[in-house]
Each structure stands twice: as C-alpha cells, then as structure tokens.
C-alpha cells in the first residue's frame, strides 16, 4: 500500500530516477524542497545521486513562510536555518529566492538567496546565498524508460 508521503512512492521515485539517468541530467540538477520548515542549502557535498559514489546534487530547502521551524536531513554545506518562533505571538517568515540567469550562452546559472523577516526587529535578514552555473545544452527527445 502506498502511503501519502514521499517515502511511500517508491515506484514513482524509481521512475523519476530512471528518467533523470536516461537523459543524463543528474549533473545539471538542483533539488528544491519546501517541506522541512527551514532554509538550508547543500552544494552537493553531502547529497549524492546515483549508484556507487554518485554525483553530488545540490539541495535547496525553501521554507517556512509562517510555521515554526524544524531541521530535517543533513548535514548541509551552508548550514540550516529553521524558522524561529517569536514569544510575541508571531513566527518569523522566511523563504528562498531563486534566480535563473540564461543569456543564451554556454551556461545557465542559478542563485539561491535565503531570507528571513524577523518579526521582533521588523527587519529582513539574509541568511545564505549560493550560486552554481551549469553547462547549457539542448536535450534530444528520448523515449520514456520503462
């Protein structure tokens, strides 16, 4: 029986992994998640994809706008920033802004900036910033793996 959470969808995860492999995309991939109620980034140092030693795949956690924070997984190369709870009755709010730069050249660059709106001080604070450029290439249409 499949359970309605990520760990329950083994068939779908396997299909997604086979599709990524068949297209050769693992080295050009950034995983974005919002489920952990924290801002955190790993540059691929601690998150590998594929058989054996695998390929380091960056992970960006981008949450939580208004929920009490938590830390899940890790370690993360750029640290973890769980959303803080304020004793004044409101949580801080935080998010990650992702900017993709594609000028039609040889590379596409992604910049992720984690920010927090501090309720107590009423100020925006930058938590972290991470950038990575990937080689730009056109993908050929291939049949879906079975």
Annotate the PLM regions.
Residues 1-146:
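Long, structured stretches of catalytic cores involved in phosphate-ester chemistry, encompassing
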């Amino acid at each position: 029986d499949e359970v309605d959470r990520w760990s329950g969808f083994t068939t779908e995860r396997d299909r997604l992994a086979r599709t990524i492999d068949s297209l050769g995309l693992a080295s050009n991939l950034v995983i974005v998640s919002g489920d952990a109620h924290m801002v955190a980034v790993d540059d691929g140092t601690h998150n590998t994809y594929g058989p054996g030693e695998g390929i380091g795949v960056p992970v960006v956690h981008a949450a939580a706008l208004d929920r009490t924070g938590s830390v899940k997984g890790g370690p993360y190369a750029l640290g973890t920033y769980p959303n803080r709870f304020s004793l004044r009755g409101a949580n801080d709010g935080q998010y990650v802004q992702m900017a993709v730069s594609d000028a039609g050249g040889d590379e596409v660059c992604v910049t992720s900036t984690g920010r927090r709106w501090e309720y107590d001080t009423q100020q925006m604070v930058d938590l972290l910033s991470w950038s990575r450029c990937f080689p730009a290439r056109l993908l050929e249409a291939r049949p879906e793996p079975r």
